[in-house]
A protein has these predicted regions:
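Terminal amphipathic helices with adjacent charged low-complexity linkers/tails
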Residues: 171-188
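Hydrophobic faces of well-ordered beta-strands that scaffold small-molecule active sites
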Residues: 21-25, 47-49
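Alpha-helix-loop-beta-strand connector modules within alpha/beta enzyme cores
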Residues: 7-21
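Conserved small/polar residues in nucleotide/adenosyl-binding loops
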Residues: 189-195
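Glycine-rich phosphate-binding active-site loops on the catalytic face of alpha/beta enzymes
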Residues: 45-59
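Phosphate/diphosphate-binding loops
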Residues: 77-112
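Mobile "lid/hinge" segments at catalytic clefts and subdomain interfaces of large enzymes
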Residues: 54, 60-73, 113-167
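Catalytic cores of alpha/beta
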Residues: 31-42
Length: 195
């Protein structure tokens, strides 16, 4: 657990102040990235991890998550140039493709859902100011913002999707409400829970 890692790294640093401490974590409890961050904050200077966290048992610290966290959230030097962070998503996808594995749509930073806005109010706020729901600009890590049309969508989602297609639609167009109702009705029948 992160607090145990902090205690252990702190103890080693006190006993061996000149040592270059490293950390190698596994994700058996889902804490590989958090434990690695705790170690770095406590003084570890060498981090071991893998692309997409692939490793034995439940995997290792995911460098695709860890690198932007350390650089963008903690201001750490990682050896990766900031102007190359935009290659993280393509690197993640390349490995998944090579090992014939579907990408994790919910992966932090690089997953397709990481910057997807599904709910109507959520999308409306994100359109006005993406910082309301996005912790970084998605382009920083090679990702992109998406406004999803779903059963939770409002006008903002639909208008954003039309804009992407080059179609101008006024938010007060009465046909828009009809379209939204029909799409939501159709989506009800595509759910796994539908009878």
């Amino acid at each position: 657990m992160p607090e145990e890692i902090t205690e252990a790294v702190t103890a080693v640093r006190e006993a061996l102040p000149d040592a270059n401490i490293g950390i190698h974590t596994h994700n058996d409890s889902g804490f590989a990235v958090a434990n690695t961050i705790a170690a770095v904050k406590a003084g570890a200077r060498q981090v071991q991890g893998t692309i997409n966290g692939i490793g034995e048992r439940c995997g290792n610290a995911n460098l695709i998550t860890l690198i932007p966290v350390l650089m963008l959230k903690y201001g750490c030097e990682t050896g990766v140039a900031k102007e190359k962070l935009h290659r993280l998503k393509s690197l993640s996808r390349m490995l998944d493709n090579r090992i014939n594995r579907l990408p994790n749509a919910h992966a932090p930073y690089v997953g397709d859902a990481a910057f997807a806005h599904k709910g109507g109010l959520h999308a409306s706020a994100a359109i006005r100011d993406p910082r309301t729901y996005e912790h970084i600009p998605p382009e920083t890590v090679g990702n992109s913002r998406e406004y999803v049309v779903s059963d939770q969508s409002g006008k903002a989602n639909f208008i954003a999707r039309f804009d992407e297609l080059g179609i101008a639609v006024d938010k007060d167009d009465p046909h828009l409400d009809t379209l939204i109702a029909e799409v939501k009705d159709c989506l009800l029948y595509t759910s796994d829970a539908a009878d």
